[in-house]
Amino acid sequence: MFVKKGLLLVVSGPSGAGKGTICKELLKENDTIKLSVSATTRKPRTGEVDGVNYFFISKEKFEEMIEKGEFLEYAQIYDNFYGTPKAAIMECLEKGQDVLLEIEMQGAKQIKEVCPEGVFIFVLPPSLEELKNRIVGRGTETEAEIEKRFSCAYEEIKMIKDYDYFIFNEDVKTSAKEIEGIISSEKNKVSRYKNIIIEKFKEEL
C-alpha cells in the first residue's frame, strides 16, 4: 500500500449554523483527525481555552505574524482578526494526517487558492429563523452584534457556490456522520490519487 497524503477539511457556514458544535462531535468520534487551531484577536467566550479553541492574541502580535508570512490565510470578521497558522498544518498533511479547519468564508476562499485539493464543506442552518434563535441562545453577543450577524447571513450563504459539499445542520450527530461519509468518499477518489496508484503498480512490474 502507499501512504495517502492527509485531507485538508475546511468547514464553514454563517454564524450560528452550528459548525463549531459539529466539528467537536466529529473530533470526539475520530481521533485520527487533527484540529487546526486558529489565531484570533477576539476575546474568549465562556468555556474557551487558549491553545485549544483558539490562540487568543493581541492585534499587534497578529500583525507581526502577517509580516512574517506565518498564516495560511487570515481575515477580518466583523471587528476581529482570524488566521490559520501555516507550518503545523502542512507538516501533518505530508505525514498523511487529516486536518480540520473551522473557518469563515473569507478565510476559506484564501485557503482554496493555496490548497485547491482541500475538501470544502458548507454548514447550513435549517432556516434563517432557526439561525437567529441559535445566535440569541448563545448569549454571548449584544443585541447590535446579533442583528449584524443575522443581516450578513444571507450574503454569507450565497458563498456556498465556492464549496464542494453542503449539509443542513438539524442534528449534530447526523451532521458529523455526513462529514464522515464525505471523508470516506474523498479518500477513495480516483482523481485525488490516480498518479500515485499508477506509479505504485508501475514499480512492481
UniProtKB/Swiss-Prot annotation:
Keyword annotations of the record: ATP-binding, Cytoplasm, Kinase, Nucleotide-binding, Transferase
Amino-acid positions noted as binding ATP in the UniProt annotation, renumbered to this chain: G13, P14, S15, G16, A17, G18, K19, G20
Gene3D superfamilies for this protein: Guanylate Kinase phosphate binding domain, P-loop containing nucleotide triphosphate hydrolases
Protein family (similarity comment): Belongs to the guanylate kinase family.
Catalysed reactions, semicolon-separated: GMP + ATP = GDP + ADP
Entry's localization field: Cytoplasm
Name of encoding gene: gmk
Molecular function (Gene Ontology), one example: guanylate kinase activity
Catalytic activity, EC: 2.7.4.8
SMART domains membership: GuKc (SM00072)
Name of this chain's protein: Guanylate kinase
Function per UniProt: Essential for recycling GMP and indirectly, cGMP.
Domain Guanylate kinase-like residues, every copy: 6-184
Cellular component annotations (GO), alphabetically ordered: cytosol
HAMAP family: Guanylate_kinase
Main location group: cytoplasm
Enzyme class name: transferase
Organism of derivation: Clostridioides difficile (strain 630)
Superkingdom of this protein's organism: Bacteria
Pfam short name (any one): Guanylate_kin
